[in-house]
Amino acid sequence: MTKHVLIIGFVWPEPKSSAAGSRMMQLIEAFQSFNYKITFASACAKQDHAFDLNLLDIQQVFIQLNSASFDEFLKELNPDIVVFDRFMVEEQFGWRVSEHCPEALKVLDTEDLHCLRKGRELALKDKALFDKSYLFNEVSKREIASIYRCDLSLIISEEEIEILKNQFKVSEHLLYYLPFLTDSISADIKKKLPKIKEREHFISVGNFIHAPNYDALLFLKYEIWPLIRKKLPQAEMHVYGAYASEKVNQLNNKKEGFLIKGYVDDVNQVMKYAKVCLAPLRFGAGLKGKLIDAMLNGTPCVMTTIAAEGMFGGFEANGFIVDDPQKFADKAIELYTDKIFWNGKQKNGFVVMNARFDKRLFISDFMYKMNAIHTNINAHRLDNFTGQMLQQQTLQSTKYMSKWIELKNSIKT
């Protein structure tokens, strides 16, 4: 019998705008490759760049927050698996799933650890060393509680698995490592990519409403790019990303060669003709979609430690990893001007992609894991007493707050 997956999205997937959107489409592809029927629901309004899920024959449902209409929808759909797109969605809808579809497997797709990103942001603002006092923040309490309430959480980075196990003491049986899932890079694809002599300029990519990307943009503009431009006056910095605001567009300066290009429909078409990708992230979490795009297109990178986290495992990076602005600029210049270095780093990227992110390495095992837990879901939950406790206590407050808002809204209308 065909199994039914309900994905509740924080937003409608935008694979051309963000790594989160690409990740969601990869999950959808994984489920469909094993013949799961998919319903995608979201309380968010669709944006212009949202992917047309009709093309994949996916049922789409607009849902309301704090509304009993979701309960009726859930009971009628009766899904086998419910995937929550980030912990905020689980907070809103998780208790309703537990109440009306208690046998459904609850899966949290963390995207990245929001609490880790927030802690690093706070430490950066304080100009302090990141430690437990920053990691154990208000977001942590919410996100870790959400992980416990779910049967399985998908973690995109091995580094984050270790943080959850060692810092938060989350049991490993609640966590599943599932990185970006990409096609392999064949010899034919490598051969067709533009060579170094056919490429020019530097590139940076990132959704501008994502706080780490905006901070990286300012760091690049004011502390790194002037050092590069001084040595390479003919080179330009091309910055691409969705949702460029006025404050972003004001950073455009043709005289300095710093160009805000904005949204691009196909990042591959600009990435493969760029010579070097720069990723000067100072805080953040998860895996960086911009580095995946760069490696897929054979574009070497200069990146910070934060950007490189979880990307390379035991393999050589597709570029240089440096945090100091002057050293970052020096390595960018070196990579831009040295063909031997450039070719070597490009090859590293191909090796990393095929060894660490080829979807064929992960999808079958992931589906087996889901099926195994779902088949023995009661036994699995008995090993998660903390989750049962949070389900009983924390969710009661969430549930009754939601019902109070629901009642309040009904009185208004």
What spans do the regions from the language model cover?
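N-terminal subdomain of nucleotide-sugar transferases
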Residues: 1-50
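Acceptor-binding helix/loop patch of EC 2.4 sugar-transfer enzymes
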Residues: 14, 103-104, 108-137, 197, ...
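Conserved catalytic-core segment of nucleotide-activated headgroup transferases in glycan assembly
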Residues: 40, 166-170, 175-268, 272
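Acidic donor-binding loop of glycosyltransferase active sites
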Residues: 79, 272-286, 299
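A short, active-site helix/loop in glycosyltransferases that binds the activated sugar's phosphate group
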Residues: 92-93, 140-172, 248
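Short hydrophobic beta-strand element within catalytic cores of glycosyltransferases
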Residues: 290-293, 300-304
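Conserved acidic donor-binding segment of nucleotide-sugar-dependent glycosyltransferases
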Residues: 318-326, 334-339
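C-terminal amphipathic helix plus adjacent low-complexity
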Residues: 348-413
